[in-house]
Each structure stands twice: as C-alpha cells, then as structure tokens.
Amino acid sequence: MPGTDLLKLKDFEPYLEILESYSTKAKNYVNGYCTKYEPWQLIAWSVLCTLLIVWVYELIFQPESLWSRFKKKLFKLIRKMPFIGRKIEQQVSKAKKDLVKNMPFLKVDKDYVKTLPAQGMGTAEVLERLKEYSSMDGSWQEGKASGAVYNGEPKLTELLVQAYGEFTWSNPLHPDIFPGLRKLEAEIVRMTCSLFNGGPDSCGCVTSGGTESILMACKAYRDLALEKGIKTPEIVAPESAHAAFDKAAHYFGMKIVRVALKKNMEVDVQAMKRAISRNTAMLVCSTPQFPHGVMDPVPEVAKLAVRYKIPLHVDACLGGFLIVFMEKAGYPLEKPFDFRVKGVTSISADTHKYGYAPKGSSVVMYSNEKYRTYQFFVGADWQGGVYASPSIAGSRPGGIIAACWAALMHFGENGYVEATKQIIKTARFLKSELENIKNIFIFGDPQLSVIALGSNDFDIYRLSNMMSAKGWNFNYLQFPRSIHFCITLVHTRKRVAIQFLKDIRESVTQIMKNPKAKTTGMGAIYGMAQATIDRKLVAEISSVFLDCLYTTDPVTQGNQMNGSPKPR
C-alpha cells in the first residue's frame, strides 16, 4: 500500500541525513586540499593516475597469469647471469646433443638427396627408390607400435590407393569442377553425424586431422565469444585434454584454463565449475583422453554447459570410431557421450584412426549450423574475388576425402562393430593381465584401447626403454611420470598380446634387480623435461626435435637403456 511505502522511507531518513553530512564533509575536505594546486596540475595528476590504473589493469589481467609471466622473466634474467647462465647453456647444449643422439629415425645408411636430378627418372626407378625409403620404416607390421598404424591390411591399402587414384587431381576448393568430390565430403559428414546421433540440424566439416578439428571448434567458439563482447575468450579444459587446445589458444589469442583431474583420472567436475568465469567461451571433455585412455563424465559437464549457457566440445578424436560401436560390440559404456546429451554442441572424431581411413582425415561436427558458421572464414574484399573456406586449408587433397569415404563404405557398420569387438577384447585382456604384474599399476579405469602404466618402485621410463630395446614403442607421459600403449587392430593378431605381456614381465623383473638405477637414453631426456621448472627451456630443447625432422646431415647415434641398441 502507498501509505506503508511512505512509512518505510521515513524510517531511512535519519541514515540518509548522516550519509549526506559525511559526503558534504568529504567534498569540502577534497576541495580545500585541492586549492593549493593549479588547474593544470589537477588535470595532469588525473591523467597520470588514470594511465597508471590502466597500466596496472593490463599488467594483471592478461591471458597469461602474472605469476607465469614473472617466472619467465625471472628465468630469463637468471640465464643472463655470467656464471649461472653459462652453466645453464652448457646443460642445455648437452641435452640437445643427447636428444639428437637418441633419435633412431636419424640413422640413415645413404646420403640425402639435396638437389634435383639433372635428368628426370623413369617410373620404375622412382618406385624402386621409394622402396628403399619405405624399408627404413620400423617394425609396425609386427604389432609393436603404440597407435600410429590402426589397420595396415594389404587389401584395405589397395582399396585406399585406388580410391585416392580416382581423385588424385581433385580439390574441394573447386566444387564446380569436382561436384562428385563435394558429394563424397558431404556424405562423410552426414554419416559421421548419424553415428554420433546428430539431429537433422547437425552438420560438420572434413579436416586434415584431429588437431585441425579441435582448432576449428575453438575458432568457432572464440568468434562466438567475441561477438558476445568477451575480449579474452577462455577454454576450460581438463589437464588431460589434448595439447591441440593449447595450440588453439596460442593461435587464436585465447586463454586455456586447465582443470585438475580426480584420482581416477576423470576431470573434476566441481573444479571445472569453479573455473568457469564470464570469459569462458567453451568447455571440453575427452572420450577418451589421450594420456590415460579414461572417459570424462560428459553428462555431468554438459549440465554445467546448459546451466551457464556455454558451448561444450567433446574430443573423440582418438576413440570416436570405437565408442559409437561399443554397445553393438557387446561392451556398452556407462554414460552417453554424443549429441544425445543436452549441452553437447560439437564433437571431433578422427576417421584416420579407428575409422581406418588414410592419414590426414578427421571430422568436426556441430549440433547446429549456427555454431559451424563461426568456423568459416570469408574474405569479402579481396581483389581476387570473395574468398571463402570452411577450415584452415584452402586447397585440400580430394584423394584423401575419396579414400576416407571408401573406408567407411568398405567397413560398414558390421565391419566396424567386429573390429571394435576384437580391439576391446584384446585391450581388456591386456588390462586384466597387467593389473596382476607386481611393481607396476594402471592409471584410472580405461574402458577403451589406451592403457597407461606407472610404478611406485622404479622410474617407469626405464620400462619404456627396456621395451624399446625389444622393439616395442611406447608413448612417454608426464605429470605424473607414466607411459602408455594404444591397442589397434594390428595388435589383435595372433600372439602379439602374449608376446607383449611376456616382454613386460621380463623387463619388470630385470628392472627390479636394481630398481633405483638411473634412466638413460630417451627416458632420461623425458625425465629431465618433467623435472625442469623453466618450461621455456623444455620448449627450447624440444624444438631441436622439430629441427631434426628436416636435417639432411649425418648424425652419430647414441644408445638406449643399459647400452642396448634399438633394433632396426
């Protein structure tokens, strides 16, 4: 009632009078204090104070934290100190040399080709030379490589080569010239969306691999965030999410906020909730995550996405073409992971892994075209005409798209279900046996094809070195120290799993004869990298690896653990 409202206002009148009295006193004090200054001085001080506030704000509120920038500056200054700096440079130089010496792929018996041949070679001669190069490849056919090659069957290879040949000269940049290729790509996207239970509005693009698929999703959500007025869009992702998200943040001027994992290696949903801010542009889940092969709880994270109206990307690059067939293969997953989950707005899945397409093929999917639109680039003002491309590349190899389509059509649902059944059966067998080997343990509860190992009794990198000496290839992991092995269709062949377990047991037994021995070779290099506080040093040393990929100079090779040369 009006009368009641007036009574309430009168109750506050004494407090308003007190507030007015204090504000008048404050105003008079400031005016009196400023009388000794000239107007130009007041203006100058106001400008300087404003600039100082802006400078402090920009110093503190940057994509990279103040503490991180302080550490970088500190380490940079330390490296410039005469004695300490020289010592660090000596150690860095030694680490670089050790890294080069322990790269078996640099061992070549013949000279590099450094100039074009004066006369072109005939077809037979070119193919013969190529066979020399392919003979350098490791023994992946024996099933000793972690991941890398997901099928490799000769008949499938022949099909993919023929499919590529049909579209060798085609380019999806020119759909008017290659309409058949456009149809192939559209069908790949639609088939993949259907596998992940996308609705009629779902859509996507074919990319060159999982990294590009992730980059495209991040680019889309960055542009969406910028449109909403977010100046520094943030990616909130688990610590285990792929490094491609760091790459996207680096490329696109975003900030990545890493969220801690629980003991079972799943993302801590409550920690993710606390990490959400007004700058959050996207949330991330992995199915599974690369390091430990553990599935993140997509439904729980999706609830956060819906509540805070934030896009959620599910990274299924590694296991995408396993998880969609798990139920029909007799290994149903506990939780949904695809577009059936409200809040999931995009998914990435690599067709060149368990889709058995050739390398250079992946799909990024969206629940609705409104998200994909932000992925596109359109240059409307170029003299060469309107330039529009769906992903990073302009020209793309049509042969890869054709071969991807061929793989999908060749396997069909029944083929993928059978392949999934064989892989998961092998992975579960290995998991159960590894759990019973003393002195090592498995991280989390991997449900798919990746098994990560650790040890409380010895440096786990020694196990990788020992297995490497037996011809096996593991992936080194860090934070915490661990190694993993990724099971593919190659490992389902007869006796591969049995030999794997035999070599693991022998290696662990050998290591436990002297569990405190130091790691050598690549294991020592990875151990040093994890222990180094200055991560810029690690990046500097790691760049040597990339430089070595392009070297055409002979390199002297070192030894693996215990002086055992890695077999060719």
UniProtKB/Swiss-Prot annotation:
EC id: 4.1.2.27
Membrane-crossing residue ranges in chain numbering: 41-61
Organ and tissue specificity: Highest levels are found in liver, small intestine and thymus, followed by kidney, lung, heart, spleen and brain (at protein level). Also detected in stomach, testis and skeletal muscle (at protein level).
Superkingdom, natural source: Eukaryota
Disruption phenotype: Mutant animals have a shortened lifespan. Mutant mice show an increase of sphingoid base phosphates, but also other sphingolipids (including sphingosine, ceramide, and sphingomyelin) in the serum and/or liver, resulting in changes in the levels of serum and liver lipids not directly within the sphingolipid pathway, including phospholipids, triacyglycerol, diacylglycerol, and cholesterol. They are deficient in B and T lymphocytes yet have high blood levels of neutrophils and monocytes along with elevated expression of pro-inflammatory cytokines.
Keyword RNA-binding in annotation: no
3'-nitrotyrosine: residues bearing it: Y356, Y366
GO biological process: androgen metabolic process; apoptotic signaling pathway; ceramide metabolic process; estrogen metabolic process; face morphogenesis; fatty acid metabolic process; female gonad development; fibroblast migration
Subcellular location: Endoplasmic reticulum membrane
Residue(s) carrying N6-(pyridoxal phosphate)lysine: K353
Major place of residence: endoplasmic reticulum
Keywords: Acetylation, Apoptosis, Endoplasmic reticulum, Lipid metabolism, Lyase, Membrane, Nitration, Phosphoprotein, Pyridoxal phosphate, Signal-anchor, Sphingolipid metabolism, Transmembrane, Transmembrane helix
Residues modified to Phosphoserine: S564
Modified residues (N6-acetyllysine): K353
Similarity comment text for this entry: Belongs to the group II decarboxylase family. Sphingosine-1-phosphate lyase subfamily.
PANTHER family per record: PTHR42735, SPHINGOSINE-1-PHOSPHATE LYASE 1
Record function comment: Cleaves phosphorylated sphingoid bases (PSBs), such as sphingosine-1-phosphate, into fatty aldehydes and phosphoethanolamine. Elevates stress-induced ceramide production and apoptosis. Required for global lipid homeostasis in liver and cholesterol homeostasis in fibroblasts. Involved in the regulation of pro-inflammatory response and neutrophil trafficking. Modulates neuronal autophagy via phosphoethanolamine production which regulates accumulation of aggregate-prone proteins such as APP. Seems to play a role in establishing neuronal contact sites and axonal maintenance.
Protein name (Swiss-Prot/TrEMBL): Sphingosine-1-phosphate lyase 1
Organism of provenance: Mus musculus
